[in-house]
Curated annotation (Swiss-Prot):
One Pfam family matching this protein: AA_kinase
Similarity remark: Belongs to the glutamate 5-kinase family.
Keywords: Amino-acid biosynthesis, ATP-binding, Cytoplasm, Kinase, Nucleotide-binding, Proline biosynthesis, Transferase
GO CC terms in record: cytosol
Lineage per the UniProt record: Bacteria, Bacillati, Bacillota, Bacilli, Bacillales
Function summary: Catalyzes the transfer of a phosphate group to glutamate to form L-glutamate 5-phosphate.
Compartmental location: Cytoplasm
The protein, known as: Glutamate 5-kinase
Chain residues that bind ATP: 14, 177-178, 219-225
Kinase as UniProt keyword: yes
HAMAP family: ProB
UniProt source species: Listeria welshimeri serovar 6b (strain ATCC 35897 / DSM 20650 / CCUG 15529 / CIP 8149 / NCTC 11857 / SLCC 5334 / V8)
């Protein structure tokens, strides 16, 4: 079943704040550099790659020497403004070391919900990919708000990555997190916790296993990753949740190794005939 992943041509890689940042709030440059190397090499191999990256607020907090995320919207958005600029500078530097060009794409929920602007986003991503450029997608935290009549926030980049995967008809979404996969119990409290190798259906029992919030600098948790998996499976797409501590694990996934948890409908798990 994992063997079919070798044929994946178009990939969406999602990396969370917990992977990009140390627990002390500093930027994990080692991981970011490895990620740039891996994705650049996948491009050299002929794969099409889109990176959905969190971290604007976390990097902004580091840049501004803040001990924690601000709680009010204007301060959060100001920090995101600083952080997104710094984050893209870091990415551009490391990807540039491997001769890989990247392009920034900032989205809000209303843009991908509205048909005309959604088509524009799809065309932009297709144009970038056709030129061998790796789009780096993030939510536009500087302007995104959540109001009663005008919702522009995705809520988290887990869902955003699934939406992007659907927009570009990706063959595989790889979600890099701070956990090895989806477990039957909490691995931080249960040393004997068993990890699912594959999930073919999101049942109420599976939903009940999802925990709470993520890191202190991020917004996601296991529940949001499960929501992203549900979104992917509804689109007949595959998603793998795995640990992003060492991004070279992506190479293992692309070789069909049994790492992380694969979310795929039963028939999709064995098939791979998507074309672009």
């Amino acid at each position: 079943m994992r063997e079919s992943l070798k044929n994946s041509k178009r990939l969406v890689i999602k990396v969370g704040t917990s992977t990009l940042m140390y627990g002390n709030g500093h930027v994990n440059l080692r991981t970011i550099e490895k990620l740039a190397m891996v994705l650049s090499d996948l491009r050299n191999e002929g794969k099409e790659v889109i990176l959905v990256s969190s971290g604007a607020i976390g990097v902004g907090c580091h840049k501004l020497q803040l001990p924690a995320r601000p709680t009010d919207i204007p301060d959060l958005q100001a920090v995101a403004s600083v952080g997104q600029s710094e984050l893209m500078h870091i990415y551009s530097k490391f990807f540039g070391e491997y001769g890989q060009v990247v392009g920034q794409v900032l989205l809000t929920r209303d843009v991908t919900d509205f048909p005309i602007s959604r088509e524009n986003v799809m065309n932009t991503l297709e144009s970038l990919l056709s030129r061998g450029i790796i789009p780096i997608v993030n939510e536009n935290d500087t302007v995104a708000v959540e109001e009663l009549e005008h919702v522009t926030k995705y809520g988290d980049n887990d869902l955003l990555s699934a939406i992007v995967a659907r927009l570009v008809q990706a063959d595989l979404l790889i979600m890099l997190s701070d956990i090895d996969g989806f477990y039957k119990s909490n691995p931080t409290t249960d040393p004997n916790a068993i990890m699912f190798s594959e999930i073919n259906q999101i049942t109420p029992e599976i939903e009940a296993l999802a925990g709470g919030r993520g890191s202190k600098f991020g917004t996601g948790g296991m529940l949001t990753k499960l929501s992203a998996a549900t979104y992917c499976m509804a689109s007949h797409q595959k998603m793998i949740l795995t640990n992003g501590k060492n991004p070279t694990i992506i190479f293992d996934i692309m070789q069909g190794a049994q790492v992380g948890t694969l979310f795929a409908n039963k028939k999709e798990a064995f098939s791979h005939d998507r074309t672009h």
